[in-house]
C-alpha cells in the first residue's frame, strides 16, 4: 500500500517571476504533474481511462494556500494523497515541501465525467488505484 505519492520538482528560471519567485499559477502545473504521476504509477493513464471506459478526470474545485514562496533553483517535493472517494468524485490533498517544510497546501475535488461532460461512476480500476493513496 502506497498511502502517499511523492513527486520532485526542480525550479527553473522559466517558473519564476522577475524577482526569482515561483509565479503563483505555476504551482497548479506542478500539482497536476504530481497527480498524474500518482495515477500513472498504478499502471493507469488518462488515455486508458478514455479508451477503456469513455471517461476522464476534471478539476471541480481547487483550494490552495501559499505559505512560503518557492524560488529559483529550489527542489520541491509534492506529497499527494486521496482524502475521500465518492461514486463520481474524489478529493486529493497535496502538500508542497522545500527541505521538509510545507510551503503550499492544496485540496482538490476531481470529478469523473463521460465524453459529454456529465459526472459518471468512477471505474473500478481507477477506484482501486486511488485507494492505494488513501489513509
Segments predicted by a language model, with ranges:
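Hot-dog-fold acyl-thioester-processing enzymes
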Residues: 2-59, 115-135
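Generic structural detector for well-ordered beta-strands
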Residues: 8-12, 65, 109-111
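Hydrophobic beta-strand-centered segment that forms part of the acyl-chain substrate-binding groove
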Residues: 39-90, 104, 110
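Basic, polyanion-binding surface patches
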Residues: 93
Amino acid at each position: 500500500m502506497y498511502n502517499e505519492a511523492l513527486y520532485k520538482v526542480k525550479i527553473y528560471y522559466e517558473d519564476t517571476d522577475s524577482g526569482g519567485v515561483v509565479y503563483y499559477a505555476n504551482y497548479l502545473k506542478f500539482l497536476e504533474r504530481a497527480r498524474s504521476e500518482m495515477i500513472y504509477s498504478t499502471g493507469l493513464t488518462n488515455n486508458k481511462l478514455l479508451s477503456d471506459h469513455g471517461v476522464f478526470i476534471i478539476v471541480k474545485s481547487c483550494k490552495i494556500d501559499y505559505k512560503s514562496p518557492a524560488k529559483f533553483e529550489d527542489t520541491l517535493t509534492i506529497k499527494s494523497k486521496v482524502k475521500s472517494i465518492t461514486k463520481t468524485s474524489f478529493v486529493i490533498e497535496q502538500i508542497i515541501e522545500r527541505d521538509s517544510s510545507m510551503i503550499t497546501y492544496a485540496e482538490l475535488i476531481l470529478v469523473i465525467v463521460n465524453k459529454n461532460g456529465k459526472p459518471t461512476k468512477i471505474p473500478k480500476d481507477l477506484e482501486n488505484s486511488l485507494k492505494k493513496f488513501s489513509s
